[in-house]
């Protein structure tokens, strides 16, 4: 009986054995490996969750920037469309130039070309478009206009109003942007940008050179390297406005007609930047290898001959432009 009781106690003790140190270490190691694997899976997901809103913002910045530029590029060169003065701006002056224009940048035309800057001009849907009626005695003289068919009934000023942005241009390739500061019965008192004289145009415009006047929109776009912002400028005294941010690179490339432009033409026997006194075009035919458009390099758009008058001069090859390629690189706002 005693021996049997002793055997039962040994069996009970054997069933209460614990883990050895080695077994415990193995178990802890397995637990750490599994926990580490879980964190390795969770942490990238957390980073992705943090980055996803920035990616969305990045796409939005890109879309806003390109949509804004595209809207104005599509309109570039749209000209007058009323009666006998109908015609695109490219028949008179270059509506796209690779530099900033306006009151705040009076001398940038001297640089001729900037790959990250562009100024676009076009006539919007407006009744304010007509001929210059009388020759201007001086570049600072007031402008008298015709109330031609298409002008608002009973409006001798053909819809021009104080504060309106306007362009005056003619067949010589000259033009000036300005702001109407005062209106009278049959004359516009004009103000336009420096630097020569705030009250003077670059020339005295005359009906004999087919001078005309119209409401205009000008849009200048460029990248501010200090803030990495795409900037928009209206051409007046107001400072540029940001369109979108985190723009780390902006490039404009130009493609044009290999054939030389055929307008504007000077008066018979006259000359301009395109034609000599015999009416012969001075610009060459560009090598194209059969393509309808050729790339217009920075050198081609800055080597002359130059059209227009100071301070609104531009390279004659800008008349060739038919397509503009925009390259924009955007970054996220994340810093880690």
Label the model's feature ranges:
Residues 62-320, 325-327, 333-335:
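N-terminal pilin/flagellin-like segments and related low-complexity appendage regions
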Residues 1-14:
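N-terminal secretory signal peptides that target proteins for export/translocation
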Residues 3, 17-70, 74-76:
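Aliphatic-rich helix starts adjacent to a transmembrane/signal segment
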Residues 12-13, 29, 45, 49-51, ...:
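Short, well-ordered helical secondary-structure segments
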């Amino acid at each position: 009986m005693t021996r049997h009781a002793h055997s039962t106690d040994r069996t009970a003790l054997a069933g209460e054995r614990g883990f050895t140190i080695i077994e415990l270490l193995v178990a802890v190691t397995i637990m750490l490996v599994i926990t580490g694997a879980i964190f390795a899976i969770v942490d990238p997901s957390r980073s992705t969750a943090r980055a996803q809103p920035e990616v969305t913002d990045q796409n939005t910045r890109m879309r806003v920037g390109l949509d804004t530029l595209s809207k104005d590029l599509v309109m570039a060169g749209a000209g007058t469309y009323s009666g006998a003065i109908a015609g695109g701006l490219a028949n008179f002056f270059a509506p796209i130039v690779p530099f900033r224009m306006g009151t705040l940048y009076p001398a940038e035309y001297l640089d001729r070309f900037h790959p990250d800057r562009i100024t676009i001009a076009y006539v919007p849907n407006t009744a304010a478009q007509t001929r210059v009626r009388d020759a201007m005695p001086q570049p600072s003289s007031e402008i008298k206009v015709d109330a031609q068919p298409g002008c608002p009934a009973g409006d001798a000023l053909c819809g021009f109003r104080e504060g309106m942005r306007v362009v005056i241009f003619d067949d010589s390739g000259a033009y000036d942007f300005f702001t109407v500061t005062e209106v009278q019965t049959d004359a516009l008192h004009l103000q336009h940008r420096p630097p020569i004289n705030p009250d003077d145009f670059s020339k005295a415009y005359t009906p004999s050179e087919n001078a005309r006047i119209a409401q205009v929109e000008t849009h200048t776009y460029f990248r501010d390297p200090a803030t990495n912002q795409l900037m928009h400028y209206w051409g007046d005294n107001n400072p540029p406005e940001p369109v979108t941010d985190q723009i780390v690179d902006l490039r404009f490339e130009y493609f044009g007609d290999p054939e030389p432009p055929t307008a504007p033409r000077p008066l018979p026997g006259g000359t301009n930047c395109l034609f000599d006194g015999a009416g012969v075009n001075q610009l060459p035919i560009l090598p194209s290898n059969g393509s309808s458009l050729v790339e217009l390099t920075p050198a081609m758009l800055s080597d002359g001959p130059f059209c227009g008058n100071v301070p609104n001069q531009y390279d004659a090859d800008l008349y060739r432009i038919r397509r503009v390629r925009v390259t924009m690189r955007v970054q996220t706002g994340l810093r880690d």
